[in-house]
Amino acid sequence: DIRTAFPGIRGFSVRSLRYMAKFAREVESEFCSDYCRIPWGHVMKLLDKTEPGERREWYLAAAVENGWSQAVLDHQIDLRLYERQQVAGKVTNFERTLPSPDSELAQQTLKDPYIFDFITAKQSAKEHDIEEQMVSNVTKLLLELGTGFAFMGRQYHLSVGSEDFYIDLLFYNTKLRCYVVIELKNEKFKPEFTGQLGFYVAAVDGEVAGEYDNPTVGLLLCKSKDDAVAEYSLRNVDAPIGVSEYRLGDELPPEYENILPSPEDLMNRI
């Protein structure tokens, strides 16, 4: 009897023993120490929701690096973060406009699509309405943007020459060590969007960024995009820009609808 062999040690319920057996079957011995860096509840979640292999190891590493709670780990698996952060299929010009390894890190940081499940808005909603909800839920926004993002401001004012300009959202990323300009478009991608964002990126480089900051990166978030059109639009753009789609809470595809906790429930458990 296990309880007799290990008196005073708890956690040997039938359920836990089944997870222990599954862990022994599926986790190779050289990786066991990695799993010791997260609580047992996290391990059970990984065993439940992922198969052995690269995808599971990616979520394990992300949970350790970011200090995710069990609720956040569960949420990120449900939102398919691993799939959304894969480099293949992302529309950027980072490889051409940023030095290595910054280009690879920026590419890895980008997601497509972004899932803003904490925002509900009508189809006809204005961009500033969506921005307001983002800023009102800035903790959730930062969670979706990913590691290292710090919020600098909404409608961030830039004075260039004798004119005034306002950036939708400005962030600083401590991993990239650069400013990130986000422009939000509540419509399908258009080629002219890259010109405006390219100007904002250049202006932040010239007016805001410091001597030791890396080149500013631009992120254009659109309701939808034609990848071929977006790729051609970036081909001759010198500013580092990525183009991604985004989804709001009332626009999630069917596979997400029944698996997500409410934003309130998620944040109460973080």
Where on the chain are the PLM-derived regions?
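Basic, low-complexity intrinsically disordered segments
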Residues: 1-270
